[in-house]
Regions:
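Glycine-rich FAD pyrophosphate-binding loop
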Residues: 20-41
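Beta1/beta-strand and adjacent pyrophosphate-binding region of the FAD-binding site
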Residues: 1-11
């Protein structure tokens, strides 16, 4: 079977990687650029603070972010360099403290289903 994948961003590259593991599948990736960042998110994977009301979008974004760890582990097992990935923290800045509190509570509730969020804290000037 031949499969054509349009775009070598995170979704296209991941699909190509897993499909290419199947001997009966011949994968070709088409992309107009080489060595550039994704146009979707500039490499930032952090859907947990999104206030979008579309639950299907959030679920897809959350599961994708959670899956990233598995992808990196699979790549490493196959001897593929994974130095492109580094899990770091996120700083959110808000002019109004109540907005920051809202996001903090949102992240706390979402951390139950997605522990990858990690530690949460509100930093003050002190």
């Amino acid at each position: 079977m031949k499969v054509a994948i349009i775009g070598a961003g995170i979704v296209g590259s991941t699909a190509a990687y897993y499909l290419s593991k199947e001997a009966q599948i011949d994968v070709t990736v088409y992309d107009h650029g080489v060595g550039q960042a994704t146009k979707a998110a500039a490499g930032i994977i952090s859907p947990w603070f999104s206030k979008r009301r579309n639950k299907a979008w959030y679920r897809l974004a959350r599961l994708g972010a959670d899956f990233y760890q598995e992808l990196v582990e699979d790549l490493a097992k196959d001897g593929i360099k994974t130095d492109f990935y580094q899990q770091t923290g996120v700083y959110l800045l808000k002019k109004k403290e109540e907005k920051l509190d809202e996001l903090y509570q949102l992240a706390l509730s979402r951390r139950e289903e997605s522990p990858l969020i990690g530690d949460l804290a509100i930093l003050t000037k002190e």
